[in-house]
A protein has these predicted regions:
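N-terminal low-complexity or amphipathic/hydrophobic leaders
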Residues: 32, 39-51
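Beta-rich nucleic-acid/ligand-interaction surfaces
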Residues: 37-42, 189-191
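Short, acidic/turn-prone active-site loops that include or flank metal/cofactor-
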Residues: 34-37, 61
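Glyoxalase I/VOC metalloenzyme domain signal
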Residues: 1-5, 10-29, 48-196
Length: 196
C-alpha cells in the first residue's frame, strides 16, 4: 500500500473569494471545476502536475443543504473567514488498506462524484480533518483518467511543502504507515499549519 499526494485543498467562504486569493498570490485564475451535490459544495482547480492539482472549495449557496456536516470544516467558515490552505488529500491504490492503517480519525469511506468523475474518499462524520488538516484525507479514484490530466497546464508546480503540528512524531508515524511517496517536511511548532 503506497499513497501519494493527490491534491492540496484551499477552503474559502465563497468560491469567488478563494479564486481571487489564488490569483492575487500567483497571478493565475484556477479553472472551473464543478459541483459536489452530496456536500453542497463547488470548486475550482489548478494543475500542479500530471496527477497533482490545487483545489479551491467553498459552499455553493445555490445548492441544497446536505443535512450533514460538510467536508473540510466548511460549515465553520463565515463571510469574514480568509481563504487558506486547509489540508491535503492522499491518493491510494487501496483506500480500504490505507484507512485501516490510519484508524478512526479519518472517518468513513464514502462514494462521491462530480460530473463524470467518481471516487471514494475518507470523511469524518463531523466534517473535521485529521491532525487539524496536516494529515491527509484519503482518496481512491474510480475514473480511469485523473482530473489533473484534464486541466490546462499553466506552468505551476508544487516545489515544496511542510506540515507543522505539535504532535509531529505521531503525524510522522501516520505518514510512514501510509507510505507517502512524496517528500513532506514535518515540524513541531506550538500550532498546526500547512505550508506549500
Amino acid at each position: 500500500m503506497n499513497c501519494a499526494i493527490d491534491h492540496l485543498v484551499i477552503t474559502a467562504p465563497s468560491l469567488a473569494a478563494g479564486t481571487k486569493m489564488l490569483h492575487d498570490a500567483l497571478g493565475i485564475w484556477p479553472q472551473p471545476g464543478g459541483e459536489h451535490v452530496r456536500m453542497g459544495t463547488h470548486n475550482a482547480l489548478l494543475r500542479l502536475g500530471e496527477k497533482l492539482y490545487l483545489e479551491v472549495i467553498a459552499i455553493d449557496p445555490a445548492m441544497a443543504n446536505p443535512n450533514r456536516p460538510r467536508w473540510f470544516r466548511l460549515d465553520e467558515l463565515t463571510a469574514q473567514s480568509m481563504p487558506r490552505l486547509a489540508t491535503w488529500v492522499a491518493r491510494c491504490a487501496d483506500i480500504h488498506a490505507a484507512h485501516a492503517a490510519c484508524g478512526a480519525m479519518h472517518g468513513e469511506i464514502e462514494a462521491m462524484s462530480r460530473g463524470d468523475l467518481n471516487w471514494q474518499i475518507s470523511i469524518a462524520e463531523d466534517g473535521s480533518m485529521p491532525f487539524d488538516g496536516i494529515a491527509p484525507s484519503l482518496i481512491q479514484w474510480q475514473s480511469p483518467q485523473h482530473p489533473a490530466s484534464r486541466l490546462e497546464d499553466r506552468g505551476c508546480e508544487l516545489v515544496s511543502w511542510s506540515g507543522l503540528h505539535p504532535q509531529a512524531e505521531r503525524l510522522g508515524d501516520l505518514l510512514y504507515a501510509l507510505k507517502i511517496e512524496s517528500r513532506v517536511s514535518i515540524l513541531s511548532p506550538p500550532r498546526a499549519n500547512l505550508v506549500a
